[in-house]
Amino acid sequence: MTLNEVTISRAILEEQHRALIDHLEMDAAVIGGGPSGLACAALLGEKGVKCALIEKKLSIGGGMWGGGMMFPRIVVQEDARRLLDRFGIAYKAFEEGYYVAKSVEAVAKLTAAACDAGVEFFNLTTVEDVMIRGDGRIGGLVVNWTPVDMAGLHVDPLTMACTCTVDATGHDAMIARMVEKKGGALTVKGESFMWAERAESQILAHTKEVFPGLFVTGMAANAVAGECRMGPIFGGMLLSGERAAELVAERLGR
């Protein structure tokens, strides 16, 4: 067999073009590929939801890669240990109720779970606006290549339709802030101080539909609510992603 460079190019272009066309209309779009977004997308995919994960950066994983201050370890509390088991993430007990896992393995296992569940990934893709029709509900996303945004080029975007949007953009709560900025009935209070116990204990209450068609998960949920941050303990991120998936699936009737 002789390799042909044009055939390689054609394979990439045709397959990715097919994936993009297929996801111009979908059930759910998860914006942000951190731990909460990955967990949410993986669990939605397992429920048979047609789902894509859109990430503005080259790689997914959010803040999980770096663990705490570049030490590639994360902590998960007892309440979320079952999700480490569910995704096949190895861990060690540290003290009672505290479990330590490798951050790189955690990202890899969550990503693999989402891939295995049929989630389509669109990295290097920035959501610059949302689409709202006459019913006042978010029904789609306005997207462009991240390098276009970084370079400040004047290039019109394209639109992808989705029934449910999940803001998993972390501390910035970017999608929620877009809605707020454009006059939607949504107020983003912004995250509060570091207080791990409070942040972790309240995150499930903040994981909800905050605007018609828009759900928030992970640190985006706490940021919208004005809640505290938690640092490198990730149980709340996983539990919030699970809860967001349940809410979206319920809304979709799955």
From Swiss-Prot:
Q: Name the residues that bind glycine.
A: R229
Question: What InterPro entries does the record tag this protein with?
Answer: FAD/NAD-bd_sf, Thi4_fam, Thi4_prok
* Binding-site positions, NAD(+): S36, E55, K56, G63, V127, H154, V155, D156, M219
List the catalytic activities from the record: hydrogen sulfide + glycine + NAD(+) = ADP-5-ethyl-4-methylthiazole-2-carboxylate + nicotinamide + 3 H2O + H(+)
Binding residues for Fe cation, per the UniProt record?
D156, H171
Q: What is the top EC class of this enzyme, as a single word?
A: transferase
The EC designation for this entry is 2.4.2.59
Superkingdom = Archaea
GO molecular function list: iron ion binding; pentosyltransferase activity
Kindly give the SUPFAM superfamilies that the UniProt entry links to this protein.
FAD/NAD(P)-binding domain
**What is its cofactor?**
Fe(2+)
Please give the subunit comment from the record.
Homooctamer; tetramer of dimers.
Can you name this protein? Thiamine thiazole synthase
Organism source for this protein?
A: Methanoculleus marisnigri (strain ATCC 35101 / DSM 1498 / JR1)
